[in-house]
């Protein structure tokens, strides 16, 4: 059952509650916002969980999911996927966050010979993707796992963890499907169990963190993962409140947050719960640590000439991707030497100039793309590798 907030809210905050006007916002920080209808869209759209997607049934497959920058991702990765055959035959694409299957569908439709391996930690998402992509079943493998376990997933699918994949795609952050289901506890505008697990089979919930972590640990989570400037006040309030009765629902936590954050701060910057909910979700799902492991593993999994694209929706994720990518395109030759040492050349080259953003047209079509940052790399061949290959070929 959906319930309204039990208090009077200022105009700036009302935008995040049921029946309020639509407000475009950061995908993650606005993730708990209430459903509403996006005004004056040129395509049939509906807002679910604060994210605008196509009306269910309005698309050709009726799955109501509009993938972000799908065409641009296709353009960036296709050269690596068509280097054997124009239809993608013999190429392998790893979709590390398959979700509802929107990006995967674009690749499988556009490249009728392509093999795709899709990963997701959410079994519900895998069920949706399986239904959406059923016509490609002979070229599709789905694996229930986190993306930091992609090496094991590749092995399970019959591929090596190193140098076996031609393309890799990450679409990071919470999914609209997870937000749509109130019982998952991701949204702060409806009352639901304080859960927030992307994978319901894992043990740790948001309620466990809120009710058992000490004050210092809570403040650290809110500060690091939510960049919440009132982290200490909120943590202290949580500890005082739970001493009387444990937190069990999102509404109870939202009420505490509204009391803990000073009134002037509540009037600006959106809903007072948004940063705390983001922080708890990241902590519950170990999102940033998983990403720190997954991106280097993905780079290792790429074959020479292979390409990777990552879509990030908030600064914490993008910083990790940016740092790993910067290291990948850097030379290993010691600074100060006048020439590049053989075998010390960069392993990768950048395919994007910094982070690409969605165009005005893309944002108008799909407001969910507003905060996205897209980065892409290609694995390149060292001269030493090329010479070794030529020598081996001559010896054979």
Curated annotation (Swiss-Prot):
Gene Ontology molecular function: rRNA (cytosine-N4-)-methyltransferase activity
GO BP terms in the entry: rRNA base methylation
Entry's EC annotation: 2.1.1.199
Keyword Methyltransferase in record: yes
Matching InterPro entries: RsmH, SAM-dep_MeTrfase_MraW_recog, SAM-dependent_MTases_sf
Keyword annotations of the record: Cytoplasm, Methyltransferase, rRNA processing, S-adenosyl-L-methionine, Transferase
One Pfam family this sequence matches: Methyltransf_5
GO cellular component: cytoplasm; plasma membrane
Binding sites annotated in the UniProt record for S-adenosyl-L-methionine: 101-103, 120, 147, 171, 178
Disulfide bonds: none
EC top class, as a word: transferase
Reactions the enzyme catalyzes: cytidine(1402) in 16S rRNA + S-adenosyl-L-methionine = N(4)-methylcytidine(1402) in 16S rRNA + S-adenosyl-L-homocysteine + H(+)
Localisation: Cytoplasm
The keyword S-adenosyl-L-methionine appears for this protein: yes
Note: Was identified as a high-confidence drug target.
Role, per record: Specifically methylates the N4 position of cytidine in position 1402 (C1402) of 16S rRNA.
Similarity section: Belongs to the methyltransferase superfamily. RsmH family.
Name of the featured protein: Ribosomal RNA small subunit methyltransferase H
